[in-house]
Amino acid sequence: MNVKKIERVRIVSATTKTPLTLIGTMVGVCQGSDTSSQDKNIGRAISCISQGHYRVLEYVDVYIVMSHISARVAREWYTHIGGQPTRLQESTRYVDCADFNAVMPPSISDNIDAFDKYSRCLDMILKTYKALSELGVPREDCAMVLPLGMTTKLSLKHNARNLMDMSRQRMCSRAYWEYREIFKDLIAKLSEYSNEWKTLCSLIFKPKCEAFGKCTEKNSCGRMNKN
C-alpha cells in the first residue's frame, strides 16, 4: 500500500477553450447584437454573469479526469446531479487493486500514533484482498473489503453552471478538506487552460458566503456574518 500526494485534476482538450466568447456569441444572437467582435462577446458574457444570469454558463462544457481522489469523495461527487453531468469511475471489477493507494488526511499524517494505526489498517485490508484473490474470489467480490480512503479515478463531463453550484458548497470552509483541495486544483488547471477561463474562474468559483455576502449555514464557521 502506497500513500501519495499527487496532482488530482487534468483538463481534457474537449473542454470549451473560449467560454466567454461562446457565451457572448450565444447571448448576442438572443439580443440581436453584433457577434463578430470577440471583445464585445467577452464583455457581453461578463455582464450577463455579473448580473446573475447563470443559465448562460450551461453552454460551456468541461471535461475532467480526476485521479488520486478517495472513493469517499467520488461517491459524494455523484450527489451533484444538476446540469446532467456524465461520469465514469475506475472499476474495481476490472482493475487489480492488489496494490491500491490511499489518501492520507492531514489530521492523520500529522499524528504519529494515528498514522501508525491508519497504515496498519490499510495493510491488513491489502493482505485480506490478496488472500481472497488467491482463494479464487473474483475481483468484484474481493473489492468489498476495500476502504473509502482508497484512491480512484473519475472521467467527468460538467457544464460551468453545475461546477459553479458545486463550488458554493464544496469551497466552504466547513466542506471536507479533500473537496476544497480538488477545487483549488480545478481552478488552477482551468486558469492555465486559457485566459478566458482564468477570468471566468474568478467570476464564478467561490464559497457561498462570498457569493451571497453572508453565511447561510446553520453552523457557521464564523468567517462571515449570518445576517
Question: PLM features: what roles do these ranges have?
Answer:
Residues 1-227:
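Family-specific signature for flavin-dependent thymidylate synthase
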